[in-house]
């Protein structure tokens, strides 16, 4: 399955994928399509962000952005969301990581980051790809 940069016409499909991702993650807060749409638009408009999709009719989405590390470690890329439908997982997902890393390099990033949810731990995949754990985040409802 080919990986490509999203087009504006992919918006509705990407929002649908974000809904699927939200459900798969088991989030307890409601999905907001308007918020997902804004997220897509923001990433599409920023020269320091990307929206990658896999398949002509998108079966996966990876959004990321690049920024200067707050402690001066250089420009870094950070994944915002990565979701691939169950039927499209496998080699297509790996191609998305390849494309993300290439995009990060193209905008001058010295490193790229990925996240792994507690409800869907894919850290072993990242480690096989050369990523290493650097920080663990905790959330507390307020």
Where are these regions (language model features)?
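A short helix-loop-beta-strand connector motif used in the catalytic cores of GNAT acetyltransferases and
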Residues: 41-52
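A conserved beta-turn-beta hairpin within the catalytic core of GNAT-like acetyltransferases
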Residues: 68-79
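Conserved GNAT-fold acetyl-CoA-binding loop/helix
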Residues: 19-40
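A short beta-loop-alpha structural element at the N-terminal edge
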Residues: 1-16
């Amino acid at each position: 399955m080919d990986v490509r940069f999203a087009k504006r016409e992919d918006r509705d499909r990407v929002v649908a994928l974000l809904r699927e991702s939200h459900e798969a993650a088991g989030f307890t807060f409601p999905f907001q399509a308007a918020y997902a749409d804004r997220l897509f638009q923001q990433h599409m408009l920023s020269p320091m962000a990307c929206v990658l999709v896999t398949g002509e009719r998108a079966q996966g989405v990876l959004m990321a952005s690049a920024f200067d590390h707050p402690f001066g470690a250089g420009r870094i890329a950070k994944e915002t969301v990565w979701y691939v439908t169950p039927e499209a997982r496998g080699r297509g997902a790996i191609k998305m990581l390849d494309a993300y890393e290439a995009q990060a390099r193209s905008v001058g990033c010295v490193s790229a980051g990925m996240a792994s949810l507690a409800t869907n731990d894919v850290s072993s995949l990242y480690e096989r790809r050369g990523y290493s754990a650097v920080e663990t985040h905790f959330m507390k409802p307020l």
